[in-house]
Amino acid sequence: MCGGSPVTEEGRGSALERWVWLLCWGVATVLALALTTPWEWLPGGLPPLDADAGMDPETLERIEDYRSRSVPVGLASVAVSVLVTAVLGLTPLGARLVRSLPGSRYRAVQRCLAVALVLAIGVVVTLPLRVWGERLARDAGLSTQTWASWAVDVLTSYGLGVTMTSLTLLTLAGLAARVRRWWLVASLAAGALVLVASLAYPVVIEPLYASFTPMEAGPLRTSLLELAADDGIEVDEVLVADASQRTTAVNAYVSGFGPTRRIVVYDTLLETTPEQVRLIVAHELGHTANDDVLRGTMIGAAGAVAGLTGLTLLAGSAVLRRRSGLDGRTPDGANRDARPDPARHSMIAVAGVPLLLAIYGLSSLVTLPVVNAVSRAVEARADVHALDLTANPVGFAAMQRRLASTNLNDPSPPQWRQLWFGTHPTTAQRIALAEGWLAAQ
């Protein structure tokens, strides 16, 4: 455990209180999403879609050739990851592996080792598929990384995952061991963590994956700053990210808040025309103008409160604890490790780490369609903002075709795949959006 002795008496926070707390925050999150998400992308809806998005047959064939191989590999990686997560968290295997780790006298260390082990298993079993996917990206001209650089990125992501997950579970264990209504405090802490992470991401995480340099003074920089000024958005700087060290894909985004806000442009994007750079940046300014990051962070924080509460309820489930081997039941049903508050014990016991990670991982996958539906609507609103700001629907459509061609994006992916994994409208939808916007003028 994380220091001290486990509190074994029944906490004041009963299961009923947790359900009420979950209901309140769950309803608040759903209402916030329902009322603030621009579900109607364009008044009157989109005009009929061109499935090929007006792209030439040669480009479509190149996209199909890449996607027909890369998508199955990506889906297989997701499937393997889900399977491993379920096996480790929902069978006794994970608990047995964790109990075999050294450091039982120092539970904080053992908990961190448990997190490192579970996440390492996930990385190792999916590594062949990830290598395959990287090889396909290289063959298609999408990836420019060396294998050494790619390996560093994999290890960096793993290290971040271990660090953040360990800190989170150490906090949960500490609260469960010391605080009566630990689940209440933990859920509020989860919401606060979302807020802190959103603020820290631009200055802590982004530099781990790219280097940034100020854009040289010139017509393009002046044009982008003027575009932001026309939009009423204060921008401190225009930066160029060395994305070409990893990819040929093009992109831009607006990062930071208030006086530290900056426009970030991939160096690969500079190979396009200034008009297309302006259009992509105009889209990103749309997110800022609509406070999408701030709004998403606040709703995400509310969702985290509800989600953490739900996790504590599931972690106390007799069925899940029995399946995970956490309750100490032998095959004949004898209970060697009972606790008056099963959820509290799931948090304190180091052997509960695989179960907690399984609940989080599987819940994230199940809720992905809802998260991505909101994301697509928000991205469509940013597209409309870019059209309003630039009044250039023809250039916008050309830019979308360029993005699809460069990034090898399927202009009309299967509906089920778009529903589950699509974070942005399809290329066909975005071009139809531009056509609908023009028709409405």
Describe each model-derived feature in a short phrase.
Residues G26-V30:
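Final/C-terminal transmembrane alpha-helix of multipass membrane proteins
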